[in-house]
Amino acid sequence: MRKFYLFYLMTHLSAQGSVMLVGGNAESYGGWSDDPYGWFVQQADSGKIVNIDVSEASAWYPAYFINLGADSSSHELQIPNIFSANSQNIYHDLVTANGIFIEGGDQWDYVQTWKGTLVDSAIHVVFNNGGVIGGTSAGLAILGEIVFDAENGSLTSDQAIANPYHPRISFTDDFLDILSGVLTDSHFNDRGRLGRLVTMVARRAQDHGEDILGLGMGIKTAFCIDQDKIGTVYGKMITVIHQTDDTELYCVPAEPLRFTHLKFHQLLHGAVYDIDNRVLVDPGENMSYYEMPYEYLNNYSDLTINGSNQSSENYGEIIVTGITGDSDNWWYGGLGTTVGDTSVPDAVIIPKMWTDYYYFPNRIISGLYGIVSDPPKFVFYLDDNCSVSINENGLMTVSNYAHILDAFPDGYAGYLNGVLPGISDATLHYFTESDTFDLSTYYIVESIDDELINSNYFAIQSLYPNPFNPQTTLHFSLMKQGIVKVNVFNIRGESIDEVVNEFHRPGEYSITWSGENVSTGIYYFKMKFENEMKVVKGVLIK
């Protein structure tokens, strides 16, 4: 049975409009883009839509919008310089539109030509009056509160990770700000940009104390965000990252980035995400819920895994094949899996992570591909001259740097058309020299106790009565808002009931469970909140 997150919508008092973010690559009549661009037309009330560019604006877009139901007055508009950007005629043309769409190109051209002009003002007027604003590629890049402006040119993930203060990392903070608290990146998967987005989010945290939401938009993908800031994925996939309460940051010039405990989602077509509350509303039809048993024990032996050796992938439980074949295997279905020697249980190991730019997409996606083949899993992304050592207790120690994607203990996972992997609620760590990570964290029940159980985010006061027949009540309190999950397991570790899987606000709660349909015995109540999990033992006596 599919599970859905319940959520609370906050009423927005402003008349702000809606937004369409497009990751790049070609739209087409009758293709993937019809649904999101049709949504754009609907948000514009089938009125006038103007597509704009600094360079020559495309006549294809208005024809496409009109074909999807927009008013026949829709048209393209080139705004090539500051003089034109301050034209009253252009301003009037734009403010009388129901939607404005910004084409791809170079975001620095847009920043230096339109920032602070009447074009800037007109876009805000349309949006604040309930209109729809959209952009693709560079047009997408300028819609967040924080803009990676590419003033000094672009950069790759390996450059960003090695030096978070690389001169090509530059921002504009006071341009359109259509999506507050958001930084976007386009062509995300096909250019392997995970490392640079993580680095840019880190820079904003380090330099300005900001907790921003990073949105990585894949090609042939649109993210359509309504007036309540609820976005739906169309096409392929988007990546969402943000800090958590446990995030640790070390970000200095000319040293590898350390940035831990980042929430990570890669969401597929049909997924729905609340960007204000940072909650997955609906995983969509392409991802299914997975969960590990409440108690699960693995054995480890002393081992060093070297990121310079491709053969290191054999130490994992799953090996992803096709990584070093065609550089587009991730996109066209050329990845596969085989079995490793399981020296590191539940692991997918990706060596030589940033060795060759053309294989960045294959290597990043292959880790997710391995997780989805049999979740939950850990992914070790290791570069040349990097390694990790694991002792017999499962404690991992990093040499130089390593990236770990932790998909435990549960979440949603699946493939789009059997090819592109999606996952929710994973945790991403960018570790550096001497950092440690306990691979056995999820394998031992953290506590089975009838007394008060505390964590950073919640407290279980009691399970009462206990023993019980047939009902008992779990009393708990929350220190922050989020999704609460409570499952009941029998003594064999089999999940027999999901008691709750809902959004809760901070406060005191009680939930009652009935053992009317099960036999006398010991039952375990597992409560999960954020990345913490606690278990309470109950005894049913009939």
Language model segments and positions:
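Positively charged n-region of N-terminal signal peptides that target proteins for export
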Residues: 1-4, 541-542
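Sec-dependent N-terminal signal peptides
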Residues: 3-13
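C-terminal and late-domain segments of enzyme folds
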Residues: 16-45, 56-61, 149, 155-309, ...
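ATP/NTP phosphate-donor binding region
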Residues: 31-32, 36, 40-92
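Flexible gly/pro-rich beta->alpha loop and the following alpha-helix that scaffold active-site loops
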Residues: 85-132, 304
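Catalytic nucleophile loop
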Residues: 102-104, 126-147, 304-317, 321-324
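C-terminal outer-membrane/trafficking sorting elements
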Residues: 452-542
